[in-house]
Amino acid sequence: MKHRIGRVEGEILRELTKILRKDIRDPRLSDITITAVECTNDLSYATIYYSLLTEDPAKEKEVAEGLDKAKGMMRHLLGQTLTVYKVPELIFKRDTSVAYGSKIDNLINQVKKQDQERENKNK
């Protein structure tokens, strides 16, 4: 059963990415990336994780509103391509791991830069 859920999750991820690029014309959704999909065991709900390249709270709210507005159309289009009896209800959540990873990367780069400056002063 878990293998089937994983396969459906991958299929939803692939199809939603296509739908966002080709069928949804909302400019609020142009900068998002679908990062993961998690389905419940009975496939009645699918949690869709997405990332943004910005940390602007106003932009985050716009994207959330755009996703909520386009949810019905996305579910309808998914129903045309998915090989499941019932299309899962879509729940969108922001994936903050990408932003967190970027923040950690910046901190590491700052520490490296400080170390190099200290080495140059000691020479």
UniProtKB/Swiss-Prot annotation:
One biological process term in Gene Ontology: maturation of SSU-rRNA
Cross-referenced InterPro entries: KH_dom-like_a/b (IPR015946), RbfA (IPR000238), RbfA_dom_sf (IPR023799), Ribosome-bd_factorA_CS (IPR020053)
Pfam family, one: RBFA
PROSITE patterns per record: RBFA
Entry GO MF terms: ribosomal small subunit binding
GO cellular component terms, A-Z: cytosol
SUPFAM superfamilies on file: Ribosome-binding factor A, RbfA (SSF89919)
S-S bonds: none
Signal peptide (residue range): none
Keywords recorded for this protein, A-Z: Cytoplasm, Ribosome biogenesis
Compartment(s) of residence: Cytoplasm
Subunit and interaction comment: Monomer. Binds 30S ribosomal subunits, but not 50S ribosomal subunits or 70S ribosomes.
Family recorded in the similarity comment: Belongs to the RbfA family.
Protein role: One of several proteins that assist in the late maturation steps of the functional core of the 30S ribosomal subunit. Associates with free 30S ribosomal subunits (but not with 30S subunits that are part of 70S ribosomes or polysomes). Required for efficient processing of 16S rRNA. May interact with the 5'-terminal helix region of 16S rRNA.
Protein name: Ribosome-binding factor A
Organism: Lactobacillus gasseri (strain ATCC 33323 / DSM 20243 / BCRC 14619 / CIP 102991 / JCM 1131 / KCTC 3163 / NCIMB 11718 / NCTC 13722 / AM63)
